[in-house]
């Protein structure tokens, strides 16, 4: 386990490679077992990283209510919380233990201090793929900032009985399931492939919620043309950058205003008269902003060298070595390590 000083050196190397601050996710193993995690978050914040998240199973956040406050005070902006479903059978199948109460408590402790949470759902056919829309509604009810659905990848330890490499869940499966389960509230076409690292890796949908409902922003503006026009596909896009880009479009687009005014049921408290920018700032207020994502990690059955070469999601190792995320975590068909700890 690297020391805090070693982590700082690794982060400085990352800044050098990237040419400036970027998004940062502190992962593991399980990062919350480190007592110096708040110190590491502060180091990252002082180095200028734009969005700092912790990737966690939530156990320590549930057991230690003070941890969430310590992390917020240190500069943490979000938690990427492993959250596979609502029922004990899902966790028993995927994690070997019932974690339902642990997940609830972790969410509660994060909400108490205003720490944003993204639910990270590993989707396994026949286990939890029937709960996808319910998970979205649950996330909205708990005022999470989003849900990221991750079709199961055969990495490391997993129950072999749950996986058939020729009959696996894909990003398209997730999108179609959401469309079916939501009865059209969400559509598969609402999701836009993310060019970085590769369109086959990820897809995103942006929305806002008001009065307990989710409305899809992608349908109100031409998001694809927006991404191309402002070069957003080549850079990390935080909320402020997205907001500014859409605000520029609003100033020149009567079509957006017509769409917005025709949706009084979307964020009703935000639909007020006034300048386009003020309307947009209210309409897309961050606490009502919601993102749904799908990310398909590669495993030994689906590895693609072209995708690996284009990867922009890296593990940072000692001496500033950057390794594509999927490559670093890849294991053999029997679960043995291939590269972790060797590169």
Predicted regions and their residues:
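Radical SAM enzyme [4Fe-4S]-AdoMet core and its adjacent flexible, acidic
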Residues: 112-284
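Radical SAM/AdoMet-radical enzyme domain recognition
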Residues: 8-26, 34-151
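Short acidic, gly/pro-rich beta-turn/loop elements at beta-sheet edges
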Residues: 64, 91, 129, 157-159, ...
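Canonical Radical SAM [4Fe-4S] cluster-binding loop centered on the CxxxCxxC motif
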Residues: 1-5
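Intrinsically disordered, low-complexity segments enriched in polar/charged residues with Gly/Pro
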Residues: 11, 193, 299-303
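Long, contiguous hydrophobic alpha-helical segments, chiefly transmembrane helices and signal peptides
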Residues: 55, 83, 123, 139, ...
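Flexible mid-to-C-terminal extensions adjoining Fe-S/redox cofactors in radical SAM and related proteins
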Residues: 233-343
